[in-house]
């Protein structure tokens, strides 16, 4: 390749990435998932599009996609809170194993019938599209305000279900190549190896990487690169040992994000941009790889297969996978069934048969691409609507427009949060002394019209003021309520109830005030309101959990770890309104 060709590639790549970034701003206005925009640009630049670029380098696409997935999952793992694992680990693992098996089997049998394939080839299609995609889930669920149980289950499922899909795909390809029709006992050994090595190397390598970052003094800009290179190394080593590199790099990121780490915010800020670049590159390359004209002949059976997977296979797998977990109500199960988002992983898995030289490899790839496209367009565009219908969205709180870590020491928890006050903030006009700041938080600076003020307790807040607050991460919910908009008060009342009570209040006293019947056993044992609600829920509580008892609807309004702090209450008849 000469210098002119290299420069041409640079120009082409930069133009495609720039177009993807600029057009991404239209995705929210059009209601189209941003990943579809990236995919469409790749298709337009491809052989059947206006770009006319011939691209069929499957090994290169495989390499780029795996590298991008490693970056996305490393970033996603760092942003997953440990509390999410406490709430959703076992349900998510059930969906990642039992759920993927059921989805793959049901989808595979339908694929064999629709495309007139051997059963084992149909099952291969089912395995290829059997797992949800972490890149799609992290991208599309961000900012939706889902309750913690639902959001965490979907995120952890997407980060941990790829080992099963990868293993099924590789196993079925080997069986087709060797003309086998039955499974051997090695099936179980391989799947244990995938999960076992993924967990062991991910956590072990993540711990070593954490110690390296905290013990070695480097310029601030090198810590993100060290974390990135370490994460990719863990991904590559695990994959080379026939373990799940995807699971390993996700757990590595989770460990880094939930332990004290040097320059944490610098790493996260850099990872945010790198994750976006990885998504753009991955979907552009996968879009270039497909030939749209090849999708037309299979459009009808592929659409029927997509509908079968979305409306039959995924719901059945979710209800079966969540059967042992009574903490999920029917609405939450239905919503999780709907969010079976497919993305880059099925397309990457569809490259495996191409590289193995199977007879129907091109068909497998086109079907997988079509299923992903339908999933993103149908499920991706309707996520917000489905979340509201299923009532799994909790009222939002105000988040800072900027947050910067005070990286004095890896163990230092303090950060600076920046809030800008709009006209709709309830605290406008209030004196600083009247703000009920969380304990140990301080207003470090107040800017008005780009001028730094020296505020006193009598200083009143005005529209447009910018406050810099020193606090810790667990102070964000309280600060968010303090600097929230006025209208959400009514929204809070509709969602949580007319009154929000302290969970430490005795249930007997609350029952007497409201004139409630029932709950004698709770009164006799002098249980608190929070204890009663947790006992009725029967699972680790999350904000937004509701239970109807004694003619009232009790809603978890605030919690810390697994303990309920505030409970909303309203009359049960209001539920129908």
Swiss-Prot record:
It is found in: Cell inner membrane. It comes from the Bacteria. One of its GO terms (molecular function) is flavin adenine dinucleotide binding. One of its GO terms (biological process) is cell volume homeostasis. Keywords: Antiport, Cell inner membrane, Cell membrane, Ion transport, Membrane, Potassium, Potassium transport, Transmembrane, Transmembrane helix, Transport. It catalyses: K(+)(in) + H(+)(out) = K(+)(out) + H(+)(in). Its main location: membrane. The keyword Repressor does not apply. K(+)/H(+) antiporter that extrudes potassium in exchange for external protons and maintains the internal concentration of potassium under toxic levels. PANTHER family: K(+)_H(+) ANTIPORTER NHAP2 (PTHR32507:SF7), NA(+)/H(+) ANTIPORTER 1 (PTHR32507). NCBIfam families: PRK05326.1-1, PRK05326.1-2, PRK05326.1-3. This is K(+)/H(+) antiporter NhaP2.
């Amino acid at each position: 390749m000469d210098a002119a060709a290299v420069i041409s590639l640079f120009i082409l790549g930069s133009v495609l990435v720039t177009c993807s970034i600029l057009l991404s701003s239209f995705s929210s206005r059009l209601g189209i998932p941003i990943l579809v925009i990236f995919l469409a640009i790749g298709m337009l630049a491809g052989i059947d599009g206006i770009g006319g670029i011939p691209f069929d380098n499957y090994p290169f696409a495989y390499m780029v996609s795996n590298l991008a997935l490693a970056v996305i999952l490393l970033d996603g793992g760092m942003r997953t809170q440990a509390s999410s694992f406490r709430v959703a680990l076992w349900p998510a693992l059930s969906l990642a194993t039992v759920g993927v098996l059921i989805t793959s089997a049901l989808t595979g049998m339908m694929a064999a019938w629709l495309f007139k394939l051997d059963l084992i080839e149909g099952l291969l299609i089912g395995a290829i599209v059997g797992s949800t995609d972490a890149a799609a889930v992290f991208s599309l669920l961000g900012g939706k305000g889902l309750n913690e149980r639902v959001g965490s289950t979907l995120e952890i499922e997407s980060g941990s279900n790829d080992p099963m899909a990868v293993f099924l795909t590789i196993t079925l390809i080997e069986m087709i190549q060797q003309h086998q029709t039955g499974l051997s006992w090695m099936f179980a050994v391989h799947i244990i190896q995938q999960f076992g090595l993924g967990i062991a190397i991910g956590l072990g390598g993540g711990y070593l990487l954490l110690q390296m970052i905290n013990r070695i003094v480097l310029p601030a800009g090198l810590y993100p690169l060290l974390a990135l290179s370490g994460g990719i190394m863990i991904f590559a080593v695990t994959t080379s040992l026939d373990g799940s590199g995807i699971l390993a790099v996700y757990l590595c990121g989770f460990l880094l994000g939930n332990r004290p780490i040097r320059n944490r915010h610098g790493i996260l800020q850099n990872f945010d941009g790198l994750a976006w670049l990885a998504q753009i590159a991955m979907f552009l390359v996968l879009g270039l790889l497909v030939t749209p004209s090849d999708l037309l002949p299979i459009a009808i059976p592929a659409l029927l297969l997509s509908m079968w997977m979305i409306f039959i296979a995924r719901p059945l797998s979710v209800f079966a996978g969540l059967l042992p977990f009574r903490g999920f109500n029917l609405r939450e199960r239905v919503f999780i069934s709907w969010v079976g988002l497919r993305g880059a992983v099925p397309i990457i898995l569809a490259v495996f048969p191409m590289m193995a030289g199977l007879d129907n490899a091109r068909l497998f790839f086109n079907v997988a691409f079509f299923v992903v496209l339908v999933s993103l367009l149908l499920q991706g565009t309707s996520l917000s609507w489905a979340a509201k219908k299923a009532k799994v969205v909790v009222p939002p709180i105000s988040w800072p427009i900027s947050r910067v870590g005070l990286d004095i020491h890896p163990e230092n928890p303090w950060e600076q949060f920046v809030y800008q006050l709009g006209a709709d903030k309830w605290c406008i006009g209030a004196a600083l002394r009247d703000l009920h700041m969380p304990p140990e938080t301080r207003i470090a600076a107040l800017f008005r019209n780009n001028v730094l003020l020296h505020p006193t307790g009598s200083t009143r807040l005005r529209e447009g003021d910018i406050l810099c607050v020193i606090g810790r991460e667990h102070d964000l919910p309280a600060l968010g309520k303090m600097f929230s908009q006025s209208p959400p008060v009514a929204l809070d009342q509709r969602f949580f109830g007319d009154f929000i009570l302290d969970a430490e209040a005795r249930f007997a006293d609350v029952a007497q005030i409201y004139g409630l019947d029932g709950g004698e056993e709770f009164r006799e044992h002098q249980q608190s309101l929070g204890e009663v609600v947790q006992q009725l829920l029967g699972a680790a509580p999350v904000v937004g959990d509701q239970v109807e008892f004694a003619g009232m609807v009790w809603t978890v309004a605030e919690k810390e770890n697994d303990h309920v702090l505030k409970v909303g209450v309203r009359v049960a008849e209001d539920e129908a309104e």
